[in-house]
Amino acid sequence: MNNINKIFITFLCIELIIGGGGRLLEPLGIFPLRYLLFVFSFILLIFNLVTFNFSITQKCVSLFIWLLLFPFYGFFVGLLAGNKINDILFDVQPYLFMLSLIYLFTLRYTLKVFSCEIFIKIVNAFALYGSLLYISYIILLNFGLLNFNLIYEHLSLTSEFFFRPDGAFFSKSFYFFGVGAIISFVDKKYLKCLIIVLAILLTESRGVLLFTTLSLLLASFKLHKLYLNTIIIILGSVLFIIMLYMVGSRSEDSDSVRFNDLYFYYKNVDLATFLFGRGFGSFILDRLRIEIVPLEILQKTGVIGVFISLVPMLLIFLKGYFLNSTKTSLMMSLILFFSITVSITNPFLFTPMGIFIIGVVVLWVFSIENIQISNNLTSGAK
């Protein structure tokens, strides 16, 4: 069973990291692999339970229950508000992937360690080789050595890619460039980190660049002295200014959409909405989903929902960043920090990609790390 679990975990990581939003195979008419993996995780869970090939920690169970409170709350507020059931279910859909965390959280200790290690390895490989490939694409495109129309014709068949007018593009899997940059920086592989950050710059995604840089700065505060932190602040500021210059007036459309969303909430909020929200299935202007995730949470679940969703994230981050002492805990906490903050401008955290990251971080910070510390204390006592 262990080998079967390892193969499944490896394939799951590859699909989530490289597959991004899960729509790469959309043009082929193939049933989404993500749904099949979701179902298969429950089949494996049953086999693990039947064969006693599982391990449960109280903290993982407590955090899992707390994580589920948020979609349950949004669902019931939506029902009480009289929102259409189809719209409510549309909002619930991304959170269903949280149920797959039951599989992760009940794995045996060795498989939990394997899950975290294989996740880091696959992100490392994808971030580096994906960045090199993307940088090569931009160079060849600017030298006129690529047929952009042909590339656009093929890649635009799926909704996974978002093209810029100058030929640059962003894929949802590119969020893992930011994760890879954090891993490389904490591992002190600075050249690799710079290559990945350069690729992020060339995607022209301001939010990903900004919050990757902030995550690297937080890592530097723990790892380096003041002069290196200053260098990172200056370098990050320069890169962001370059990004703003590259994007230019093209950012006005997306900025105006975000501003209109904020203005709509401001004009329509009342005390009940502010406290309890309007529930899942409620709209901001004519959309169920918006780019500013915190605003969407506030609109649909109020400050109560913000509190419910934020508390477990803060607990995980604070424990990994301040209380645990290992390099991997620092890495994991900053990956979570990036996932939370990048969701201010791009929906990421409560997607299958973001939910899986939450699961992996919880595994390390609240399960693996605790057992390792306990074992070290026991060894020391002997």
Swiss-Prot record:
Keywords from the named record: Cell inner membrane, Cell membrane, Lipopolysaccharide biosynthesis, Membrane, Transferase, Transmembrane, Transmembrane helix
Periplasmic side: 23-34, 82-94, 147-167, 207-208, 248-300, 350-352
GO molecular function: transferase activity
CC terms in the record's Gene Ontology section: plasma membrane
Spans within the Cytoplasmic topological domain: 1-3, 55-62, 113-125, 188-189, 227-229, 319-329, 371-382
EC number: 2.4.99.27
Gene Ontology biological-process annotations: lipopolysaccharide biosynthetic process
Catalytic activity: n lipid-linked O-antigen repeat units = a lipid-linked O antigen + (n-1) polyisoprenyl diphosphate
Segments passing through the bilayer: 4-22, 35-54, 63-81, 95-112, 126-146, 168-187, 190-206, 209-226, 230-247, 301-318, 330-349, 353-370
Location(s) in or outside the cell: Cell inner membrane
Top-rank taxon, per record: Bacteria
Signal peptide: none
Deletion consequences: Mutants produce a semi-rough LPS, which contains only one O-antigen repeat unit.
Pathway(s) the chain acts in: Bacterial outer membrane biogenesis; LPS O-antigen biosynthesis
Predominant subcellular localization, coarse grouping: membrane
Topological category with respect to the lipid bilayer: Multi-pass membrane protein
Cited function: Polymerase involved in the biosynthesis of the lipopolysaccharide (LPS). Catalyzes the polymerization of the O-antigen repeat units on the periplasmic face of the inner membrane, leading to the formation of the lipid-linked O-antigen molecule.
Protein name (Swiss-Prot/TrEMBL): O-antigen polymerase
Species lineage: Bacteria, Pseudomonadati, Pseudomonadota, Gammaproteobacteria, Enterobacterales
